[in-house]
């Protein structure tokens, strides 16, 4: 069928002499000399359509345009592309245009590549544009810069704002909507003036830009707005319900018109704003997006390295990252009057952003219609500010700058989620003295988590500048619920402090002060101590202060706050008594400035693992208890001392059972089982009567289920691999052979969240011989095997404080051996009670001597709660005894088969249970640990079946069951061999 563009109102027959046609299955290239434009209302692609190297110039209209008011192009799963072309320069013309609505849908690919738009309408122009469905939408390496053409005889004039606002890919007055893209939506390396991709044409910017319901990746990369808005300029912006990853990288907004220099205050048109999005009078919204979102390496000459808007709203359903964005003015990542950011299952990270004001976020001054505000809510996932800097003051940290003192601030965290400021937050306007009432700062008015201010990540040089650790809010601070944490050298100054419902947690070197002129007050009823920060020799007593009165009263309580309880009580300081001078209350009022009451320690006697003892808190220094530096603490007034006293003089240590690490010695049991699996695979050679050189290859499987016994851990091991065997079978029945193989698998703990992924390499020698004992044939067979196994243990500890898992990893190796000597003899015929049974079922007896064991190397764990495992060992000796039955089938249509069954009893006559010493690295406490105590009596069943396959050799199967109290082991092997 010929290629066609069908239209209900336009017939292409009139253009047959001017257009080239081809089959629908091959792309059609329309060369530059094709007469344009196409006109139609409803156009359908019956094949791939490629517009290449077209020059529209100043005399030709749109390449594709509507015959009436609206234009619809349906791709029908074909490609529409424009490459290496120049658009029309005529007024109201573009590559694709309509007066009212344009609908582009269902393309396998819609591609604009290496095109130049010379007209004021950009590349796609209509009051409303809709792009829906399809697999791939790609705009790459295009240029949409525009300046008006001079009249005849005139020289070109300097571009003005009115001209450059007409250069974008999409020229839209009402709205642009992109939806349902299945694989990728890409805008890459596009150059324009205001908004390289989208610029609102409405007078008040009342245009919408929407991307929703897309399944694939969304990419905006390396786009440049020479005058402002690297990607989008003005209009309401919405990204909603997209499922794929969203990446905004390397976009930039410059100020080629010099608007920033001419208008230092925000003008009608905003020059150099928004490296990605600039819509200073409208809202930018991200919600319902399931994939990760990343803004990185974007740049703005003005404000908003990534986004400048009046209102910015973000709900993070997945991970969101703002990193390494830069703005020369304010807001390295975001510049907005109103900022609403929350998590809903994903985390949000602001890291490495830079700006002169607000390295990550700058909240602008209010306007008449909007007072603005900052609302951050770590509802389900953390919000973190780290390593954000000022761009014009090297070495100065800055997370958020709030330019107006009257802006309200709400910082919230729920449950185990945290909001962490490693960089300071500053609210003031140094250019203008504060007027009116300062805004309120509310902590957890809608949450019960932790809002944290810390100087933990400051470098030594950054610590020399106190600004890097100081956050400032001029308004009143209220802790409504959850906790406000100021720790590790951070300082927070506010107006007044009220924390009667929520908790104030202080750490080493922290300072929380109310400094509202001469009226600052501080009232706290719930205190928390960040224990970890104080357990170092360089600790500093925290400060809680006010200009007038400081009160810790109304039945005050103190909570011991720790991120990991088990790790905390591993600290060797708790072997002995220790006193922590926790907090000093400071008031500038000479008399009656400080009020204290006896403090109740909430969780003083909570059961825990680690060193055992008890806590107490008092406003007086306790006797005979040194501080964490080993010195006697100073006796300070208005200071709360927190004291630990061990339960005995030698420090009793209680080990958490899940840290025993019994998987390490149990790995020797697993290695021994793997070697027995290897032996099981050699059964075919032991029962074969063939003569010659035999090579075989087979698949092996090993399954071991060991049940827990009280507080002793069990394990579940699954291993599989291969075995290759070469053996010489002699005429006298003797055999000598070698085997090589590998097994891979995993062992899981039955009690705890720990698993060991291992692989074992095995090499063995084996043989068989026949001996005549008093005229009776006796079969003697033997094997020796060596195994080298590598083990990688991964352990997860659930942390009830954070509701998250802490992880640790450990690697070690085992050297294992297995040897046996066995004999098979028809002694059952010599016993009168068993003689007839032996003759009827072809039964013989057997006895074996087995020896197995090995050594494990030492290993040091990394990660959470690290341990060290010393070298370990384990050995086992057994004397299996049982009977053997043989059966042979010779069907007419089926190949002959030989079945061998061994049944017996295996007593373990000597054993060294696998064991080693485990040491807690934090304190050196050693604990001997043993592997699972296996029962010493087992019953086993071994089944071997050989199938003689003509021209191929033999196929065989082995299955073994070893059953003992609290453990079941299964061995399986399937193989093929060939006689040479």
Swiss-Prot record:
User: InterPro entries of this UniProt entry?
Assistant: Autotransporte_beta, Autotransporte_beta_dom_sf, Polymorphic_membr_middle, POMP_repeat
**Which keywords does UniProt give here?**
Cell outer membrane, Cell wall, Membrane, Secreted, Signal, Transmembrane, Transmembrane beta strand
SUPFAM superfamilies referenced in this protein's UniProt entry, alphabetically:
Autotransporter (SSF103515)
State the SMART domains in the record.
Answer: Autotransporter
Signal peptide interval? 1-24
Provide one Gene Ontology cellular component. Answer: extracellular region
Query: From what superkingdom does this record's organism come?
Result: Bacteria
> What family is this?
Belongs to the PMP outer membrane protein family.
Please report the name of this protein according to its UniProt entry: Probable outer membrane protein PmpH
Origin species, per record, is Chlamydia muridarum (strain MoPn / Nigg)
Lineage of the source organism?
A: Bacteria, Pseudomonadati, Chlamydiota, Chlamydiia, Chlamydiales
Give me the gene this protein comes from.
pmpH
């Amino acid at each position: 069928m010929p290629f066609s563009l069908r239209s209900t109102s336009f017939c292409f027959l009139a253009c047959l002499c001017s257009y080239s046609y081809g089959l629908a299955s091959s792309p059609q290239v329309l060369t530059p000399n094709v007469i344009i434009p196409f006109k139609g209302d409803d156009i359908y692609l019956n094949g791939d359509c490629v517009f290449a190297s077209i020059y529209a110039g100043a005399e030709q209209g749109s390449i594709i345009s509507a015959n009436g008011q609206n234009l619809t192009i349906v791709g029908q799963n074909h490609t529409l592309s424009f490459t290496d072309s120049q658009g029309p320069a005529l007024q109201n013309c573009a590559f694709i245009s309509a007066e009212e609505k344009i609908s582009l849908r269902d393309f396998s690919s819609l591609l604009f590549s290496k095109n130049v738009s010379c007209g004021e309408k950009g590349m796609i122009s209509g009051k409303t544009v809709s792009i829906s469905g399809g697999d791939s939408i790609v705009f790459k390496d295009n240029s949409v810069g525009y300046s008006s053409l001079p009249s005849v005889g005139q020289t070109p004039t300097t571009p003005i704002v009115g001209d450059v606002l007409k250069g974008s890919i999409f020229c839209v007055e009402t709205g642009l909507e992109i939806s349902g893209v299945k694989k990728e939506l890409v805008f890459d390396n596009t150059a324009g003036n205001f908004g390289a991709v989208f610029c609102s044409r409405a007078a008040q910017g009342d245009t919408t830009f929407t991307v929703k319901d897309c399944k694939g990746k969304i990419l905006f990369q390396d786009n440049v707005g020479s005058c402002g808005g690297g990607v989008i300029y003005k209009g309401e912006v919405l990204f909603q319900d997209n499922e794929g990853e969203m990446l905004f990288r390397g976009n930039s907004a410059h100020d080629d018109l010099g608007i920033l220099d001419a208008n230092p205050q925000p003008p009608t048109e905003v020059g150099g704003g928004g490296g990605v999005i600039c819509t200073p009078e409208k809202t930018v919204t991200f919600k319902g997006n399931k994939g990760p979102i990343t803004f990185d390496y974007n740049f703005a000459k003005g404000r908003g390295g990534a986004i400048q808007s009046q209102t910015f709203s973000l709900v993070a359903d997945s991970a969101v990252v703002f990193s390494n964005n830069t703005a020369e003015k304010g807001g390295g990542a975001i510049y907005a009057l109103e900022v609403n950011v929350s998590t809903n299952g994903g985390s949000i990270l602001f890291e490495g952003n830079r700006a002169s004001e607000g390295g990550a976020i700058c909240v602008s001054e209010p306007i008449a219609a909007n007072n603005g505000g900052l609302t951050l809510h770590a509802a389900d996932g953390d919000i973190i500010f780290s390593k954000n800097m000022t761009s014009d003051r090297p070495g100065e940290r800055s997370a958020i700058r709030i330019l107006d003192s009257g802006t309200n601030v709400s910082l919230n965290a729920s449950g185990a989620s945290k909001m962490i400021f490693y960089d300071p937050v500053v609210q003031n306007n140094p250019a203008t003295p504060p007027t009116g009432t300062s805004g309120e700062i509310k902590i957890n008015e809608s949450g019960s988590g932790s809002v944290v201010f810390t100087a933990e990540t400051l470098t030594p040089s950054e610590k020399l500048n106190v600004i890097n650790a100081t956050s400032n809010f001029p308004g009143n601070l209220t802790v409504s619920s959850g906790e406000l944490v100021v720790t590790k050298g951070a300082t927070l100054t506010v107006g007044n402090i009220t924390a009667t419902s929520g908790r104030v947690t202080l750490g080493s070197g922290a300072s929380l002060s109310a400094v509202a002129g001469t009226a600052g007050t501080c009232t706290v009823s719930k205190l928390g101590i960040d224990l970890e920060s104080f357990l170092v020799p360089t600790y500093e007593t925290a400060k809680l202060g006010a200009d007038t009165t400081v009160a810790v009263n109304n039945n005050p309580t103190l909570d011991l706050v720790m991120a990991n309880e088990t790790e905390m009580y591993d600290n060797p300081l708790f072997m002995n008594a220790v006193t922590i001078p926790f907090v000093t209350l400071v008031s500038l009022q000479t008399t009656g400035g400080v009020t204290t009451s006896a403090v109740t320690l909430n969780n003083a006697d909570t059961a825990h693992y680690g060193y055992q003892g008890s806590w107490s808190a008092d406003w007086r220094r306790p006797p005979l208890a040194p501080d964490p530096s080993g010195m006697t603490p100073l006796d300070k007034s208005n200071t709360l001392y927190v004291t630990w006293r061990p339960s005995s003089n030698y420090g009793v240590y209680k080990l958490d059972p899940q840290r025993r690490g019994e998987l390490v010695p149990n790995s020797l049991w697993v290695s021994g089982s793997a070697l027995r699996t290897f032996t099981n695979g050699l059964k075919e050679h032991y029962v074969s009567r063939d003569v010659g050189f035999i090579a075989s290859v087979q698949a092996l499987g090993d399954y071991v289920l060991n049940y827990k016994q009280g507080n002793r851990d069990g394990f579940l091991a699954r291993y599989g691999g291969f075995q290759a065997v070469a053996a010489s079978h002699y005429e006298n029945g003797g055999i000598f052979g070698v085997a090589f193989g590998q097994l891979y698998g995993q062992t899981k703990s039955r009690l705890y969240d720990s698993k060991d992924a291992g692989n074992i390499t095995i090499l063995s020698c084996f043989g068989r011989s026949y001996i005549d004992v008093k005229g009776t044939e006796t079969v003697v067979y033997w094997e020796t095997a060596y195994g080298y196994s590598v083990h990688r243990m991964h352990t997860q500890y659930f942390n009830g404080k954070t509701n998250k898992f802490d992880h640790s990893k450990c690697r070690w190796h085992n050297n294992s051996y297995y040897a046996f000597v066995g004999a098979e003899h028809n002694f059952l015929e010599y016993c009168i009670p068993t003689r007839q049974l032996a003759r009827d079922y072809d039964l013989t007896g057997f006895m074996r001597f087995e020896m197995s064991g090995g050594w494990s190397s030492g290993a040091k764990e990394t990660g959470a709660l690290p341990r060290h495992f010393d070298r370990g060992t384990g050995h086992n000796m057994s004397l299996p005894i049982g009977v053997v039955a043989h059966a042979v089938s010779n069907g007419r249509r089926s190949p002959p088969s030989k079945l061998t069954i061994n049944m017996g009893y295996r007593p373990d006559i000597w054993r060294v249970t696998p064991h080693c010493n485990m040491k807690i690295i934090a304190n050196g406490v050693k604990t001997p640990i043993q592997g699972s105590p296996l029962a010493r009596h087992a019953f086993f069943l071994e089944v071997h079946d050989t199938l003689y396959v003509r021209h191929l050799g033999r196929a065989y199967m082995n299955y073994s069951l070893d059953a003992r109290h609290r453990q079941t082991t299964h061995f399986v092997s399937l193989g093929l061999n060939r006689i040479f």
